C-alpha cells in the first residue's frame, strides 16, 4: 500500500513539473519579445493563440487525475 502511494505521488509530481516547465517556456518567450521592443526594434506581434497560452500560464488551474484532486 505504501509503495502504491509512493508511486502515485511520484507520478503526480513528475506530471505537474512537466507542465510547469512548459509554462515557464511560454513566459521566457514573452520576456524575450518584450526585450526586443526595449532595444528599439519592433516588438513581435502576438497571435490570439499565443496570448491565450500566456494567460493560461499565469492562471493557476486544477489538475484532475483519477482519484487525485489538486487545485
Curated annotation (Swiss-Prot):
Which residues are connected by disulfide bridges in this protein? Answer: 62-71
**Span list, region Disordered:** 22-54
List, as start-end ranges, the regions of compositional bias called Acidic residues. Answer: 22-31
What task does this protein carry out? Shows nociceptive, edema-inducing and kininogenase activity with release of kallidin from low molecular weight kininogen. The cleavage occurs at Met-Lys bonds.
Question: Keyword set for this entry?
Answer: Disulfide bond, Hydrolase, Secreted, Signal, Toxin
Spell out the activity regulation. Answer: Inhibited by tissue-kallikrein inhibitor TKI and trasylol. Plasma kallikrein inhibitor PKSI527 and classical inhibitors of serine-, metallo-, thiol- or aspartate-peptidases evokes a minor inhibition of the peptide digestion.
Which organism's genome codes for this protein?
Thalassophryne nattereri
Any signal peptide, and if so, which residues?
1-18
Family the entry assigns: Belongs to the natterin family.
Provide the tissue specificity: Expressed by the venom gland.
Entry protein name:
Natterin-P
